[in-house]
Amino acid sequence: WTAVVVSAAAGAPVIGAIAVAIAVGIHLWSCDTPEAEIRLLLVAATMGLAWESALVLAGLLEYSSGIWIPGLAPFWIVAMWILFATTLNVGMRWLRRSTAIAAVAGGIGGPLAFFAGASIGAVELVSPVIALISIGIGWAVMLPLLVRLAIRLDDSHRLVEQSA
């Protein structure tokens, strides 16, 4: 996270994207079922691109670096969604305990991450209060969805092995 946000704030978002590519490569190499994990990462990337672009188009966020197509979220924020998704079946596995826990974690953690990113210049919160509330609501909905998908994909290989 730090490498991506700091490099984006410094106007060199490619550095963070390279760090994400290396981390994701190592993660996939260590996975029992990389195919299922890739599906999770692709869904997270798509979800992230759509959500972050909606925030940009709504005028709530402005990014100064990494814009590939005007009106869309920068590539580095999509890379962060992919990086975050790599934690769902590992370090963030505790979110599986309940949908409410995942919703609260997303509702608090999402805005905090954006506040931190804005404080170092990676993103501008155009209307800070409205932006942070919107981000909190979005993450409170999306994190439980990502957790459920992670569970489904993580457990799918076990079902195949048991039926064989």
Where are these regions (language model features)?
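Aromatic-rich, lipid-facing transmembrane alpha helices and their immediate juxtamembrane interface loops
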Residues: 1-164
